[in-house]
Amino acid sequence: MGTLYICPTPIGNLDDVSQRLIDVLNNVDLIYCEDTRRAKKLLNHFGIETGIESYFIGNEVNKIEDIKRHLENNLNLALISDAGTPLISDPGNKLVEIIIKEGFRVESIPGPSSVLVALTLSGFDISNFQFLGFIPKSGKEKSEFLTKLLNAQMPSVCFTSPKRVIKDLDYFEKNGLNSQITVCRELTKKFETIHRGDIKEVIEKLSSDNLKGEITLVIAPSELNTNVNFEVDSALKILLDNGVPKRDLAKAVSLITDIPTNEIYDKIKDF
């Protein structure tokens, strides 16, 4: 039985390719890629002659069956995306889920990720964070996305395009988001640009920037949210100090917030 290797590719700087990645791509029997043209440029740069096939959302169902058959025939395969780590807002989630459930071997090669690079450049406390993918273009999905940001207790990472980033941030600001934001453009490339500040400041900075390339946003929890959380924590501590059992308090808060009881209990058990 063969192995499927999850292989991250550079997000901008070819020097970020590891020797292990080169060895894997040289030695597998076939490489599945999001865009064959971009994959060829990468492989040619490193002198890798392994064959390639496309794998994207449009052909996913048929390709999964092909991949399963190849693995059953003891072929080793690699999955790469256009840039960064596959499955992170890229094709491959369904494939890996099925492959694992059916007992095939999967290995993940560590490597570049714009999500992690942006987080480490944000200047925020990133001991916890949430990744929200691409900002929806409009409608109910965008409203629900904003709600996640407004309710966030930790930094949020998301993607948008250069054409939409100012419009997206303007929408968030006009609908109540009061946060510090880090905007990362062209990460690891020659013209990497980082803008930091509150949402209004960042919009002003972007208005005078030559917006091209990939955009990764890191959005801190809303300042209003932070103040409210402090007040809620204080109230919980007062109730506990006055003899309310932790389990009972966790159940009551869970009923109000829809947050699972065990998560509430974990939060208050050390108060």
Task: Enumerate the language-model features and the residues they cover.
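General beta-strand structural signal in soluble alpha/beta enzymes
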Residues: 108-111, 158, 183
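A contiguous loop/helix-start segment that scaffolds small-molecule binding in enzyme catalytic cores
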Residues: 75-76, 155, 162-271
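Generic beta-sheet signal
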Residues: 3-7, 73-81, 129, 154-158, ...
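A glycine-rich beta-strand to alpha-helix segment
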Residues: 72-117, 163-167
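Short active-site oxyanion
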Residues: 25-31, 103-106, 154-156
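Class I SAM-dependent methyltransferase SAM-binding "motif I" and its flanking Rossmann-like core
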Residues: 94-152
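Conserved helicase motor
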Residues: 55-61, 135-138
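Glycine-rich, flexible N-terminal cofactor/catalytic loop recognition
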Residues: 1-58
